[in-house]
């Protein structure tokens, strides 16, 4: 007997999956969800329980049907006897018939009308009696969220008016179409003495339900590890992969820097390893932001002659957020200025402590150019993969993740996929993110056409009807019609979702998400002007104690807010706190596009108060800062009794006389205050628009220099 899943077995018996799950639990069988496969012995035990009870119900129904047929036959015989009795009566005389012809005609009409009325009444009465006989109050019912009064009455086999009356006695005015909440539903059911249970609704459009991890699957075999290489620019990521794979990837790319995500598979000591070569860590984060978790091991490449750099720190934070083991590859040890010990010392500050120093992080010194240490690195990858016990079932229909996608001029939409479970075949009907299709051709990482690909294998496919996004999941279906239906439904849902507000956390909606149980950790990224301020702010935020949510600092750094910070905040559903710093142009655009909340402050107390108030639900709708323009200082003039006049050129928006201003130098805020004078030539001006020059003096501030940015802003009252 072939294995069946719980929902398939339930469908055969016209039962709810929940009933099967409850019965299995009563048999002391551990059940994770409705997708779990049933063993042969379990199916036999369930057959005895459910099919036997169904057989009894069928016999009972047949007995009732036979009894009903017998009654119908008796009624028919009675009618025939009555009819023959009426026919045997003698007819009246012709004279009497002629004499009362009109009267008989009228009587006949009245009689027909009376008979028709009686027949109509009989038709109505007969089904009513039958329903009253079969209607019984069930001992238990199941319901879906949002059940109405009418639907509940139908399930309980009672009149809607009875339920409406009970609701009225509870102080609830309702009609037949009123939806009931769980608390009210429990009160009504308890009043009727009926047990209720919420139905588990399975959404086939949710591709995540097909990514089940069945550890008891006897067909599961060991699969290759998926490794991501990350690190600072020019520290040798692609050169390292090139040395491992014995190809010259770097030479064929512009400037020697990786331009796209490459996925490659190599074999070492009889075991395969799949490498994802990401451009820095942006793609890695983008995939994780869409819910994809494809990486098993992260290799952090650090140059021995350069040490820990800003992108190295960001890569460490990304790896920690993804919760995958990290192996540190200390590259360029063959250079005269190499100092591996310094690298290890610097990385201990970020929680990566070498095994030799009592930690649990593997450090491998190597040279990507000469090939020294490559074998040691591959050996360490094999050991870490062995400890993780990575397994997959090649006999299932394939599921996995999109690594990259493009629109090819000759082939149409093409996508690089990583198979995570099952086997992908040419001709399979597939749903990829919000698109679908049938696989027309499949190419491996060597550029060769293949017909099938097993777990942890990267392939490029064609045949889908649109370009998916990196990080989208894919699922193979046995029926092309089903794949089309699900793909179209997902596309429509994505269009609707794009029109709605983003659900990224912000201080404005933080308390609402806490109430709904959606928030347990508030992820925070802190950027400041000096390291001391950043550390002080991080320590202060960690001390905030509000029940139901914790503050988690996921990244801190000195300098202006950049696009990478916004990407990390979006992937981690976090917010960005800027202390005495401003976002650059790219960060502003990215934050607006991804709806990431950025809060800019100059006083630590204000930051703490704002976040604590948001966590307690006390954040009042007051004012929002709106930047109205920027001017660049081109020349300065010092005038006695006046101060420093900044000869400026308005580069963005406009500068108004009543606006607040801040002076920014190299992305760091130096001063915030009010405008003193705004002049156009010798005349006072109310405002100066973009593209015009003006003279600016600032109250109580004269330390203006050429190249400074004067940013004008207004405080606008908003409704939250």
Curated annotation (Swiss-Prot):
Low complexity bias spans: 60-75, 99-113
| Record's subcellular location | Cytoplasm
Q: Which GO terms describe its molecular function?
A: GTP binding; GTPase activity; translation initiation factor activity
Q: Where is this region: Disordered?
A: 48-138
Q: Where is this region: G3?
A: 277-280
Enumerate the residue ranges of region (G2). 256-260
Comp. bias intervals (Basic residues) = 114-123
Q: Where is this region: G4?
A: 331-334
Which keywords does this Swiss-Prot/TrEMBL entry list?
Cytoplasm, GTP-binding, Initiation factor, Nucleotide-binding, Protein biosynthesis
Q: Does the keyword GTP-binding apply?
A: yes
Give start and end of each tr-type G domain: 222-391
Locate the residues binding GTP.
231-238, 277-281, 331-334
- NCBIfam families assigned to the protein according to its UniProt record, in alphabetical order: IF-2, small_GTP
Q: Note the HAMAP family from the entry.
A: IF_2_B
Q: What is this protein called?
A: Translation initiation factor IF-2
Supply the source organism for this entry. Answer: Staphylococcus epidermidis (strain ATCC 35984 / DSM 28319 / BCRC 17069 / CCUG 31568 / BM 3577 / RP62A)
Quick one: which gene encodes this? Answer: infB
């Amino acid at each position: 007997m072939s294995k069946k899943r719980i929902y398939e077995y339930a469908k055969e018996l016209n039962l709810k999956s929940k009933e099967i799950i409850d019965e299995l639990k009563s048999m002391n069988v551990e059940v994770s969800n409705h997708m779990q496969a049933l063993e042969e012995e379990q199916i036999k035990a369930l057959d005895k329980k459910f099919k036997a009870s169904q057989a009894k119900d069928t016999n009972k129904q047949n007995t009732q049907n036979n009894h009903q047929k017998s009654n119908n036959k008796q009624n028919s015989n009675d009618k025939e006897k009555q009819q023959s009795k009426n026919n045997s009566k003698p007819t009246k005389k012709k004279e009497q018939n002629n004499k009362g012809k009109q009267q008989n005609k009228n009587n006949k009409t009245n009689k027909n009308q009376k008979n028709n009325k009686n027949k109509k009444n009989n038709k109505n009465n007969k089904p009513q009696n039958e329903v009253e006989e079969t209607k019984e109050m069930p001992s238990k019912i199941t319901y879906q969220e949002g059940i109405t009064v009418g639907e509940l009455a139908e399930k309980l086999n009672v009149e809607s008016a009875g339920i409406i009356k009970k609701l009225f006695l509870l102080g609830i005015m309702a009609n037949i179409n009123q939806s009931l909440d769980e608390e009210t539903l429990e009160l009504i059911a308890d009043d009727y003495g009926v047990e209720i249970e919420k139905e588990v609704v399975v959404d086939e459009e949710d591709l995540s339900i097909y990514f089940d991890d069945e550890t008891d699957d006897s067909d599961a075999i060991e699969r290759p590890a998926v490794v991501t290489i990350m690190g600072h620019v020019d520290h040798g990521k692609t050169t390292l992969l090139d040395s491992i794979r014995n190809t010259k990837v770097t030479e064929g790319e512009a400037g020697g820097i990786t331009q796209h995500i490459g996925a490659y598979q190599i074999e070492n000591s009889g075991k395969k390893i799949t490498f994802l070569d990401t451009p820095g860590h942006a793609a890695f984060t983008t995939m994780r932001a869409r819910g994809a978790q494809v990486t098993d091991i992260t290799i952090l490449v650090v140059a021995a002659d350069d040490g820990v750099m800003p992108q190295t720190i960001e890569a460490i934070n990304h790896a920690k957020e993804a919760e995958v083991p990290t192996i540190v590859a200390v590259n360029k040890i063959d250079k005269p200025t190499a100092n591996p010990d310094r690298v290890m010392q610097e990385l201990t500050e970020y929680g990566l402590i070498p095994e030799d120093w009592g930690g649990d992080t593997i450090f491998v010194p190597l040279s990507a150019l000469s090939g020294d240490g490559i074998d040691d690195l591959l050996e360490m990858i094999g050991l870490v993969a062995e400890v993780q016990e990575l397994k997959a079932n090649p006999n299932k229909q394939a599921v996995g993740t999109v690594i990259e996608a493009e629109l090819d001029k000759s082939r149409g939409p093409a996508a690089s996929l990583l198979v995570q479970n099952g086997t992908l075949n040419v001709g399979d009907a597939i749903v990829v993110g919000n698109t679908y299709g049938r696989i027309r051709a499949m190419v491996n990482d060597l550029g060769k056409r293949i017909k099938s690909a097993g777990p942890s294998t990267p392939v490029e496919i064609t045949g889908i009807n649109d370009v998916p996004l990196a990080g989208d999941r894919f699922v193979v279906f046995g029926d092309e019609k089903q794949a089309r239906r699900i793909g179209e439904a997902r596309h429509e849902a994505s269009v609707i979702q794009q029109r709605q507000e983003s659900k990224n956390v912000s201080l404005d909606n933080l308390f609402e998400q806490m109430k709904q149980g959606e928030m347990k950790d508030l992820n925070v990224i802190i950027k400041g002007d000096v390291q001391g301020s950043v550390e002080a702010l991080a320590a202060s935020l960690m001390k905030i104690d509000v029940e139901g949510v914790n503050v988690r600092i996921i990244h801190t750094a000195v300098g202006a807010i950049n696009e990478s910070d916004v990407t990390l905040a979006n992937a981690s559903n976090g917010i960005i706190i800027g202390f005495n710093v401003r976002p650059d142009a790219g960060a502003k655009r990215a934050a607006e596009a991804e709806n990431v909340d950025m809060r800019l402050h100059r006083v630590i107390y204000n930051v703490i108060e704002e976040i604590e108030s948001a966590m307690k639900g006390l954040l009042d709708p007051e004012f929002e800062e709106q930047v109205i323009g920027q001017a660049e200082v081109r020349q300065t003039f010092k005038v006695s009794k006046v101060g420093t006049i900044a000869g400026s050129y308005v580069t963005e928006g406009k500068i108004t006389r009543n606006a607040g201003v801040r002076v920014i130098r190299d992305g760091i805020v130096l001063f915030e205050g009010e405008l003193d004078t705004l002049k156009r030539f010798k005349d006072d001006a109310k405002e100066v628009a973009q593209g015009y020059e003006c003279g600016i003096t600032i109250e109580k501030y004269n330390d203006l220099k050429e190249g400074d940015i004067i940013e004008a802003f207004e405080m606008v009252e908003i409704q939250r």
